[in-house]
Amino acid sequence: MPYLIPILYVIVSYTFFLLPGLFDQVVELQIISALLPFLMGVVNLIVVLTVGRKWSKKTLLNCTLIIKYGLIPFYLIGGCITISVTLAALFPLPLMVLFGLVTVVFLIFGYGILLGAAPYAIAYLIKSCKEGRHSKAVVILSGICQFLFSFDVFSMMILTIKEKHLVKTTIAVFAGVCLAILFILLYVLSIFV
């Protein structure tokens, strides 16, 4: 049961790109569907502040990993789109400047989704510090990383390995991310060569 909200958050985060297109005629539904990930972020915060206080450190870590690992493809694809659109906006053609606005919108939505994922990680960090598992310096540094793209995932990977929890899964996810980045770079290089 504690994993239902994190799984739902990941699903909502992926569908927020798709849902506004389903409601072509009703603007209110488009707005609500675009804001759904932010509303789910508030739900995450409420769940962590109420029920989540009673959960174990492992449960909070698992909830964090569901969200962080589940959103890796979202941020890889979104990052590629953002970089492509930003580079396209640099070309001196009419209306290409408007592409810069797309970059700003993607960054705002991406950061909003990042913020919505943070409550579980912060709760885990606080609980692990209280139990003496991690030092205050590590907890503060990891807490700051929860608000920075990519660093949030890598800091949780390091802490997960340090906890000796889901080590094989974490290594497999890290290898998958490295392979995905390598394929993206090779694809970009093949375009220019």
Regions found by a protein language model. Give the residues of each.
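Alpha-helical transmembrane segments of polytopic membrane proteins
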Residues: 29-41, 103-114
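C-terminal halves and exits of single transmembrane alpha-helices
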Residues: 67-93, 110-119, 150-153
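Membrane-helix boundary/juxtamembrane motif in polytopic membrane proteins
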Residues: 63-67, 126-148, 167-170
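Hydrophobic, aromatic-rich membrane-embedded alpha-helical segments
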Residues: 41, 139-159
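Juxtamembrane boundary at the C-terminal end of a transmembrane helix
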Residues: 184-193
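Alpha-helical transmembrane segments
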Residues: 1-16, 178
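Membrane-interface alpha-helices
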Residues: 133, 156-180
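Canonical alpha-helical transmembrane segments
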Residues: 39-56, 121
